[in-house]
C-alpha cells in the first residue's frame, strides 16, 4: 500500500500535473502571508512536500498526518500555530471530523489563520482527470466542497478565496 498518493502529484512524471500542483501550493503560500516568526502547522502533511519546501525558506513548520511516520508530532493539539495549512485534506474526512478539527484549531490558538485547498469536483475537474487517464470520481473523497465550506464559514471568517482553474478552491480563514 502506498503511504501518500498526493505526493505523486507534486513529483508526477506528467509535467502538467506537476505544474498544476505546485502552482496551487504557491498560491496558497502567497495567500498565507507567512512571516519568519510564524509557527506553521502543515495539517495532513503526507510525505511532506509543502512542509519541506517551507522549511527550505527558513520557516518554522511542524507537520502532522494520521500516518505516524510522516508526522513531526503525535498530537497536533499541543502546539499553538499562527498559520495552519490543510491542503487537500478535508474532503477525505467526515463532516463531523471536519467540525471537530476546526474546534481543535480554535482551542489551540484564538488568532490562527487557516489556509486550505479543496477540490471542486465539478465537471471541469472530472474532465481534466479523465484527460490525465484517471477516474472522474476520486477514490477516498468523502465530504464535498459545499459541505466543507458550510462548516468552515459557520466557524471561521473567510478572508479571501481563489477559484484555481475551476478545479480547486483555495481559501484563507481567520478565527472569529
PLM segments and residue spans:
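Conserved N-terminal segment of class I S-adenosyl-L-methionine
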Residues: 1-79, 83-85, 99-102, 136-150, ...
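A short helix->loop->beta-strand "cap" motif at the edges of active sites that frequently abuts
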Residues: 59, 109-112
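Feature marks short, surface-exposed loop/turn motifs that line or immediately flank catalytic pockets
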Residues: 70, 93, 122-124
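A short SAM/SAH-binding and catalytic strip from SAM-dependent methyltransferases
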Residues: 85-96
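Helix-to-beta-strand junctions that scaffold the AdoMet/dcAdoMet cofactor pocket
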Residues: 93-94, 108-110
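Conserved beta-strand signature within the Rossmann-like core of class I S-adenosyl-L-methionine
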Residues: 111-119
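Short, glycine-/aromatic-enriched active-site segment of Class I SAM-dependent methyltransferases
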Residues: 119-139
